[in-house]
Amino acid sequence: LGLVFFIPYKGARSLAQDRPKNRIHDADVVLSRRLLVPGSDAFKSYYKNHPEVLETDVQSRRATGGLDQLARYYHAGSYAAALANQNVIDHLGTLVYDFKPPSKKEAKVNPEKAGGFIRQWLTRSGAHSVGFTRLEDYHLYSFKGRGPNSGSPIGKQHAYAIALTVEMDHRMMQSAPQGSSVMESYDQYLQSGVLALKLAAWIRELGYDATAHIDGNYEVICPLVAADAGLGTIGRMGLLMTPRLGPRVRIAVVSTNLPLSYQQAIPDRTTLHFCHLCKKCARVCPSSAIPDGNRKIIDGAQRWQIDSERCYHYWVSSGTDCGRCISTCPYSHPDNGFHRFIRWGIK
């Protein structure tokens, strides 16, 4: 497929990465809505204001459920591993806000050297890529939708953000939507969360405030932050498309007031062009949740948007977090010489 893109094409660089103008309420995210307790005041209030999603959400609640023994792709070992990881992640989530406060004295920091140290340290610890950006309003959810502070407004407390990715194993993801893919997914949610938490703790030791944004405790939209930090481009499936691994990564973010050097990210328009023509993820999506048409203006930005209700309903029906789009994306192929050559040709 990549060889087709060696043919010169005038429109290849006409597609630009756009950014949203509006902030998103975390309570509107389907993974937050699933936590609403039927019959509770919060449940009644939400669906009174959003009746358009009530029917689909009720259908999803009636489905087997994620990681359930009655699920279509149930596998005792891999499901238990995923649930074990989720349990640890939930406990790590308590450390996001219940952490040692910053040291009283701020260390003198050279922004460029601090960034270099962070990148080397995290890469040695297992990160695939690390990037830095200024924290923007559109990076943040407007209100919290999960946890004890659900419904609380989210303000911009920090000036900078550090995004990191970790690789999901190619062989494990090739089995998607089988149980081993959800096991790998949770493995890397945990790994990215550990890296973000220890980075936030390190920054506090230097006397600067920092917050880790990990699975179940996001105040930021990680793909947007990672794209602005130069780690990739947001593609057709709504995920971060990294240069070497495509969407086969998990992301975590640390927001902070630690002075950091960053450069304005230059979007890779060739990736957008590839997504514009390829459409493989849309064709293989078992729930037809990925659009196969052109980008549209959504929330003030020109982009593709998946049908998250359809996607999630398949999750709870199959018992895994699917991953078919990730496993079939041509950019997800192993990072070897042949596929690096194909990616070079696409550019």
Model-based region annotation:
Residues 1-133, 158, 327, 331-347:
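Iron-sulfur (Fe-S) cluster-binding modules
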Residues 119, 125-346:
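Catalytic cores of enzyme domains
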